[in-house]
Curated annotation (Swiss-Prot):
It catalyses: butanoate + ATP = butanoyl phosphate + ADP. Catalyzes the conversion of butyryl-CoA through butyryl phosphate to butyrate. GO terms for molecular function: acetate kinase activity; ATP binding; butyrate kinase activity. CDD domains: ASKHA_NBD_BK. The gene is buk. Keywords: ATP-binding, Cytoplasm, Kinase, Nucleotide-binding, Transferase. This is Butyrate kinase. It comes from the Bacteria. One of its GO terms (cellular component) is cytoplasm.
Amino acid sequence: MAYKLLIINPGSTSTKIGVYEGEKEVLEETLRHSAEEILKYATIFDQLDFRKEVILKVLKEKGIDINELDAVVGRGGMLKPIEGGTYEVNEAMVEDLKIGVQGPHASNLGGILSNEIAKEIGKRAFIVDPVVVDEMEDVARLSGVPELPRKSKFHALNQKAVAKRYAKEHNTSYEDVNLIVVHMGGGVSVGAHRKGRVIDVNNALDGDGPFSPERAGGVPSGELLEMCFSGKYSKEEVYKKLVGKGGFVAYANTNDARDLIKLSQEGDEKGSLIFNAFIYQIAKEIGSMAVVLDGEVDAIVLTGGIAYSDYVTNAINKKVKWIAPMVVYGGEDELLALAQGAIRVLDGVEEAKIYK
């Protein structure tokens, strides 16, 4: 049976929705919200009714009857750290999404919106693999400073989706393989997946790992300390150097990887150096994760928007091919990944997890 699903993925200035029948996309729409509309609301949670009305209006215009839906799936938000999987939305989750226990983020509305619409039609609401998925082993959490433990914040939804895709295409299960998955987008996350769990991964938002189009990755801590207390920068300005204006933006004044690739291909000296450093850092992180997996790696999987570039993937493969074969799944399909998570539960392949 092909289940009919509504998928909701809220961003800061847009809400992406999809309607799926099984894994087949019936509708995909990006509902854009102007700055003026968003600024009317003091908090992200205050946008709930506004976004819900916009979603229902578009569904009606497109001839989608919400009463025909089997479930509603939202993108998971900044909840407490949880293990990966599909979670049924409950009151405890809604309360934590309202307050944003790990910070404000538009994705916090995903679970709440899906719950609101599902309640109206008497159906179930789910979230799947939010960014706060944390399956790290205790040994990976120590940083050297007890007050600063390493944290798991990464592209969990896409990393898990492509890992499961690899397993399916190789006639095995995600729980039976060891993979290193590299997501390359605005941020870069490199995860060690051992038998269905991400036992180590860099904090791709503001922690460690390779630099990326907009993020600094791991930086020398002593120099960062000097910068913080130099009196030249506010806390916000330093944070912006790490997230938003780090990486490619800092070195080349662009957040578009294609610009760096072009400069490197043309032999531009500075552009080539930045590009080579980007490849070097990703390959180095892959090497680290190979050690985490005791050298037992079935494949290295590259994904995210930058993985569409053969120039990038070939350069990485040249450095890491001695570890394991490489597989490339360019881009990311968050709506499909959310749909697949719900289908696994509705089909009885997995049980819905309970958020506490």
